[in-house]
Amino acid sequence: VVADTLRFFIHWKQKQDRTDYDLSAFFMNKDYTNAGHVSWTRLSDDVGGATVVHSGDITSAPNGASEFIDIKLNGLTHSYIVAQVNRYVGDDFSQAEESFFGFMERNEKQKGLPFEPKTVKVKSEVRGKGQVAVPAVFFRNKNGWFCKWLDMQLTGQPICNTVEGNKATTSMMIKSIMERKNLTIKDLMDLLPGTQDETKMAYVGFQQPETLSKGITKVMTLDNLTGLIPQ
């Protein structure tokens, strides 16, 4: 993320019933403990040294509706920002005529419409059977702020879901994701039977090249990549 302000947005349009989706930002410390939030129940706050402002609560969307949260990243001391969309009442995410979340990178000098296209970095549909969508988590390290796209959902409650009601579940989920070590191609190759020989090399790619470097004894492409997975 390279901007002064991170802006979350949710847009939805109801199909059957009066539908209220609530955009929230949940902040966590380095140890994944609760560090505050901004949502329709708390429209603005100084969180971890940064100003965070919600655009306001909209409770129905017959013609479409949007909510925004602006987060000033300069000075923010917390380690994680979790984006949430809570279904309060109405159509499920799978039933709504339209439902999507995204984020923008905004600078102080920028002015224009809320959906100014050039500032939108990512936008994706919110669909699924859960009642609480967790589209993304933003995390900070020594090089700045970064986004990990999740596209996950919590089961939640039948109605009246709020960020206050699911902080514990959300923090546990984010911790498990951020601390998980994903398998690499090397990990899978190490699981194959046989004695490892450090002098052997393998080529892994979408397709086999016309020429191979000296020393490559195995070629893995999309045609046989599944062979790396042990039976």
Where would I find each of the regions flagged by the language model?
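Intrinsic-disorder/low-complexity signal
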Residues: 1-231
